[in-house]
Amino acid sequence: MSLTNEQIVDAIAEKSLMEVMELVKAIEEKFGVSAAAPVAVAAAAGPAAAVEEQTEFTVTLKSAGDKKVEVIKAVRAITGLGLKEAKDLAEAGGVLKEGASKEDAEKMKKDLEAAGATVEVK
C-alpha cells in the first residue's frame, strides 16, 4: 500500500513536537542531509559586514520636540551657528552634520535626544 503525500502530512500533524523532531533526525541520518538552511545564514551575514564598514555618518534633526530652547542650545553647541540660524534649523529640521565619525555622530545624537529632539543617524 502506497501512502499519498496528504496522508503523510496528516500523520505527521497528529504527532507531538518531540516525535516530529525525532522523525526529522531520523530522516537526516537516513539520507545524509540537514534540515538547516545554510543559505539564509550566509545571506544574513552579508549586510552586517556592510554596516560595519561605514565610517562616515550624517546626523539629521527630525523634530525639536517640546523642549525647543534646549534643542536650540544643543544645535548651537554642535554646529557653532548663531542663535537665529540654530533656531531656524531646530524648528525646520534638517542635516546638522555630514561626514561625522561614528563617535561624533553618537555623541550628537545622545546630546540632542537628551535635549528632547528626534534625531536620525545614517
Curated annotation (Swiss-Prot):
An annotated GO BP: translation
CDD domains with a match to the protein in the record: Ribosomal_L7_L12
Pfam families, per the entry: Ribosomal_L12, Ribosomal_L12_N
Gene3D superfamilies registered for this protein in UniProt: 3.30.1390.10, Single helix bin (1.20.5.710)
GO molecular function, one term: structural constituent of ribosome
GO cellular component, one term: cytosolic large ribosomal subunit
Membrane-traversing stretches: none
Record function comment: Forms part of the ribosomal stalk which helps the ribosome interact with GTP-bound translation factors. Is thus essential for accurate translation.
Quaternary organization: Homodimer. Part of the ribosomal stalk of the 50S ribosomal subunit. Forms a multimeric L10(L12)X complex, where L10 forms an elongated spine to which 2 to 4 L12 dimers bind in a sequential fashion. Binds GTP-bound translation factors.
Stated name of the protein: Large ribosomal subunit protein bL12
Organism taxonomic ancestry: Bacteria, Pseudomonadati, Pseudomonadota, Gammaproteobacteria, Lysobacterales
Gene name of the record: rplL
